[in-house]
Swiss-Prot record:
Domain (GIY-YIG): residue spans on this chain: 71-149
Entry protein name: UvrABC system protein C
HAMAP family named among the record's database cross-references: UvrC (MF_00203)
Pfam families listed in its UniProt record: GIY-YIG (PF01541), HHH_5 (PF14520), UVR (PF02151), UvrC_RNaseH (PF22920), UvrC_RNaseH_dom (PF08459)
Lineage: Bacteria, Pseudomonadati, Pseudomonadota, Alphaproteobacteria, Hyphomicrobiales
Gene3D superfamilies in alphabetical order: 5' to 3' exonuclease, C-terminal subdomain (1.10.150.20), GIY-YIG endonuclease (3.40.1440.10), UVR domain (4.10.860.10), UvrC, RNAse H endonuclease domain (3.30.420.340)
UVR domain residues: 259-294
Purpose of the protein: The UvrABC repair system catalyzes the recognition and processing of DNA lesions. UvrC both incises the 5' and 3' sides of the lesion. The N-terminal half is responsible for the 3' incision and the C-terminal half is responsible for the 5' incision.
DNA damage listed as a keyword: yes
BP term (GO), one: SOS response
Complex and partners: Interacts with UvrB in an incision complex.
Organism: Mesorhizobium japonicum (strain LMG 29417 / CECT 9101 / MAFF 303099) (Mesorhizobium loti (strain MAFF 303099))
Length: 688
C-alpha cells in the first residue's frame, strides 16, 4: 500500500490537537561529561609553601614555586588572596612557563595585572600536552577565570530526533544528552531553526510529533491529520509498512540524499497524474514544495563539504566576533555568532585557539574544522580533538576553492555581526547614561534587574527576573521563581513579589555577601580598571525595576529594609498609565513624587522594552508551568519514579491507567524496574 493511500473522511477536530512534545526541557536535561582519555595526573599543592611567604604576592611569590616544579606538561591555576581563580593555563613544561612569570617581565598590561594579583598557584601534571590542553579547556569553562578568553552564551545546540523506540517513530526537537534511542540530526544553530525545519518535514513526510501516551490513546486521528501534517498511524490511517517508508524517506533527506528523495516523489507525482489521480498528485506536489522550503532556508549547500564546522574571527573596537557555520551531510544547518570576552591586546590566533578548545569541550566534533586563519598550537589542538572524538579530526585553513568560499562567507558574517553589536553597544551606553540622569543615579547602571509575576487567578504563579546591562539583555542571567508559599492568597501580587524578593536577595547575600563587586574590583585594579575587560558580570544589581505601582514598591522596599540592603539597591516602580496606554506610565522612586516621562523620550522607550521583555519571560514561564501541570501523570506522584522509569513504563503499557492495572509480575518485566520498584508502583495504585 502506498504511504499516501489514506482515508479521506474527516474524523479529527480542533480539540484533538496533540500536545507538543519538546525534549528540550532543562529539568530533564542530563549533564554530559566530555568523553576522551582519562587524565592521569599528580596534584601538587603548593598553597602551604606560598602561605609561608609572609604575605608575598606577584612575581616574588611565584619565584618561590619555580624551583620545585617539574619539567613536564601540565596545567596551572593562578589565584588571588581571596582564593578566586585569576587564570588557567597549560604548558609543555610547567617549570619553563612559570619561570617566565617569575622573572617579572611582561609583554602586556593584562599579564602584569594578573601577576601582581597572584598570591598562590596550583599545578596539575599530566602525561601529555594533549591531556593538558583538554584539561585546561574544561577548567576554563568551569571556573571562568577573569583573565582567560571566555565563551559566552554557551548553551548546547538543538538537534532533530527521529525516535527508534516505537513502532511508529516520531520527530522531535532535542537538546541535551543523546540517551534516547533514535537518529539525531544536527547540530542546528537555534531552536527556531529546528522548529521551522520540523514543520516543513512534517508537511513533506507526514511524521507524528505527539507523545507516546497520546498516540496509544487515540480512537480517531487528531487535527494534524486533517491539515496534512501527519499520516495518522495511531488509528490505522496508514499501515506500519507505509509509515516506515515515510520515515525512511525522512532519514534519507536528513542524511544528505535529498535529490534521491525529491526524484522519487516527483516520479510518484507524475505517475499519479498519468493515472488521473489528481488529489494524490497534489499531495506529492505539496510535499515537494515543503522540501524546497527547507532547502531555501539553508542558504549555501556545498557540493564538496559533507561534514564540517566553519569558524571565522573578526576583531574591531576592542571586541571580538567568532562566526560558526554548521554543515552536515552536505547541508547548511545554520550559523551562530559568538562574542567571547578577551583582552583587546590578544592576537586573533590566540583568541580563536582558546575558543575552539572550549567550544568542543562538551560538543560532538565534526570530521573537518575550517578556519579563516590559523590558530596557536593548531596541530596539537587537532590531535586533542581527534583523541576525544576517537577518530581523525582535521583542522585546516583553506586557501582556494569551495572551502575558501565558505570561510570567506563566515568572515563576512563575522564582520557584519560585530558591526551591528558595536552600534547596539554604543546606543545602549547612551540609553544607560540617560537612564541614570532621569532617575538620579550617580553613574550609569551596569546591571538592571526587572521583575514581574504571572498567574491565572493565583494558579501556577511564577515570578520572573530579566537582566540588562551595557551589552543589552543578559539572557544567561534570567531567573524564574515558582511561587511556593501556601500562605499567599490566590492573586495576591504583593505577596508574590515579597516572596520573589526574599528568595532572590537572601540567596545573593548568602552567596556573594554585602560587598559591591564593582567597588571591590575597582579598588583592586586601581588605575588599570579602565583596561581590565576580563572582570565578570556583577552579581549585585545597581537598579531593580518593578512592574507595579506604589503598593508593589512598598512591599519591595520593606523586604530590602528587612535584609539591610535598602541603600545598596535603587528600586524603581513602573505603573501602567491611564487606560493602560503605553507612554503614560508613571514612575515611583524613593524620595520623589511619582512622575511621567515625555512620550517620545528615548529613556521611556528603553524602560518599556525592559518591561515588555520581563512580561514575555514571565508569561512564557507561566505557560510552561501550566502546560506541565496539565499533562502531569499519576506516575509523577510516585517517589523513586523519575523521567527514565516513567518513560519505560509508558512505553511498555501505553498509559498511566494501564500501569495502574498491571500486576507486579508484569511491572517487573519492564527494563529498569526492579522488584522493589514494581512493588512501590503497585502499592501506590492499590492502597486502600
Amino acid at each position: 500500500m502506498s504511504p499516501l493511500d489514506q482515508k479521506n473522511k474527516p474524523r479529527g477536530g480542533a480539540d484533538d490537537l496533540p500536545p507538543e512534545i519538546d525534549l528540550e526541557d532543562e529539568a530533564l536535561e542530563e549533564i554530559v561529561e566530555p568523553t576522551g582519555p582519562d587524565v592521569a595526573f599528580t596534584a601538587i599543592d603548593w598553597t602551604p609553601h606560598a602561605g609561608d611567604a609572609e604575605g608575598m604576592v606577584g612575581a616574588e611569590v611565584i619565584q618561590t614555586l619555580v624551583k620545585r616544579l617539574p619539567n613536564a606538561p601540565g596545567v596551572y591555576r593562578m589565584m588571588n588572596a581571596a582564593g578566586d581563580v585569576l587564570y588557567v593555563g597549560k604548558a609543555r613544561s610547567l617549570k619553563k612557563r612559570v619561570t617566565n612569570y617569575a622573572q617579572g617581565r611582561f609583554h602586556t598590561n593584562r599579564i602584569g595585572r594578573m601577576v601582581r594579583e597572584t598570591s598562590t598557584m596550583e599545578f596539575v601534571v599530566t602525561r601529555t600536552e594533549i591531556e593538558a590542553l583538554l584539561l585546561e579547556a574544561n577548567l576554563i569553562k568551569r571556573l571562568r577565570p577573569r583573565f582567560n578568553v571566555l565563551m559566552r552564551d554557551d548553551k548546547s545546540f538543538p538537534y532533530i530526533l527521529l525516535t527508534g523506540d516505537h513502532v511508529s517513530p516520531g520527530i522531535y526537537k532535542h537538546r541535551g544528552a543523546r540517551s534516547r534511542k533514535g537518529d539525531y540530526f544536527g547540530p542546528f544553530a537555534s531552536a527556531g531553526a529546528v522548529g521551522r525545519t520540523i514543520n516543513s518535514l512534517q508537511r513533506a513526510f507526514l511524521l507524528r510529533s505527539c507523545t507516546n501516551s497520546f498516540y496509544e490513546n487515540r480512537t480517531r486521528p487528531c487535527l494534524l491529520y486533517q491539515i496534512k501534517r501527519c499520516a495518522g498511524p495511531c488509528t490505522g490511517e496508514i499501515s506500519h509498512e507505509g509509515y516506515a517508508e515515510l520515515v525512511a524517506e525522512a532519514k534519507d533527506f536528513l542524511s544528505g540524499r535529498s535529490q534521491k528523495v525529491k526524484t522519487e516523489i516527483s516520479a510518484a507525482m507524475q505517475q499519479a497524474s498519468e493515472d488521473l489521480d489528481f488529489e494524490r498528485a497534489a499531495i506529492y506536489r505539496d510535499r515537494l514544495a515543503a522540501l524546497s522550503h527547507v532547502q531555501s532556508h539553508q542558504g549555501i549547500n556545498p557540493a564538496t563539504v559533507d561534514e564540517a564546522d566553519v569558524f571565522a574571527i573578526h576583531q574591531e573596537g576592542g571586541q571580538v566576533c567568532i562566526q560558526v557555520f554548521f554543515f552536515r551531510t552536505g547541508q547548511n544547518w545554520g550559523n551562530r555568532a559568538y562574542f567571547p570576552k578577551a583582552d583587546p591586546a590578544l592576537e586573533a590566533a590566540e583568541v580563536l585557539g582558546s575558543f575552539l578548545a572550549q567550544f568542543y569541550d562538551d560538543k560532538p566534533t565534526p570530521r573537518n574544522i575550517l578556519l579563516s586563519r590559523g590558530v596557536e598550537d593548531q596541530e596539537l589542538l587537532g590531535e586533542a580533538l581527534s583523541t576525544r572524538a576517537g577518530r581523525k579530526v582535521t583542522i585546516s585553513v583553506p586557501q582556494r576553492g569551495e572551502k575558501k568560499d565558505l570561510t570567506d562567507n563566515a568572515l563576512q558574517n563575522a564582520r557584519e555581526a560585530l558591526g551591528r553589536r558595536l552600534a547596539e553597544t554604543s546606543t545602549q551606553g547612551r540609553l544607560l547614561a540617560g537612564f541614570a540622569e532621569t532617575f538620579g543615579l550617580a553613574k550609569p547602571p551596569v546591571r538592571i534587574e526587572v521583575y514581574d509575576n504571572s498567574h491565572i487567578m493565583g494558579t501556577n504563579a511564577v515570578g520572573a527576573m530579566v537582566v540588562a546591562g551595557p551589552e543589552g539583555f543578559v539572557k544567561n542571567q534570567y531567573r524564574k521563581f515558582n511561587i511556593r508559599s501556601t500562605e499567599i492568597t490566590p492573586g495576591d501580587d504583593f505577596g508574590m513579589m515579597r516572596e520573589v524578593m526574599e528568595r532572590r536577595f537572601s540567596r545573593l547575600l548568602k552567596e556573594h555577601g554585602d560587598v559591591a563587586p564593582n567597588d571591590a574590583a575597582s579598588a583592586e585594579a586601581g588605575d588599570d580598571i579602565e583596561d581590565d575587560i576580563s572582570g565578570s558580570f556583577p552579581a549585585w544589581p545597581d537598579v531593580i525595576l518593578i512592574d507595579g505601582g506604589q503598593g508593589q514598591m512598598t512591599a519591595v522596599r520593606k523586604i530590602l529594609a528587612d535584609l539591610g540592603i535598602e541603600d545598596r539597591v535603587v528600586a524603581i516602580g513602573i505603573a501602567k498609565g491611564q487606560d493602560r496606554d503605553a507612554g503614560r506610565e508613571r514612575f515611583f522612586v524613593k524620595g520623589r513624587d511619582s512622575f511621567s516621562l515625555p512620550v517620545r523620550d528615548p529613556v521611556l522607550y528603553f524602560v518599556q522594552r525592559l518591561r515588555d521583555e520581563v512580561h514575555r519571560f514571565a508569561i512564557g514561564s507561566h505557560r510552561a508551568r501550566r502546560k506541565k501541570e496539565m499533562v502531569k501523570s499519576p506516575l509523577d506522584e510516585i517517589a523513586g519514579i523519575g523521567p527514565g522509569r516513567k518513560r519505560a513504563l509508558l512505553l511498555a503499557f501505553g498509559t498511566a491507567k494501564a500501569v495502574s492495572r498491571a500486576a507486579i509480575e508484569d511491572l517487573r518485566k519492564v527494563d529498569g524496574i526492579s522488584e522493589q520498584v514494581a512493588k512501590l508502583v503497585y502499592n501506590h495504585f492499590h492502597e486502600s
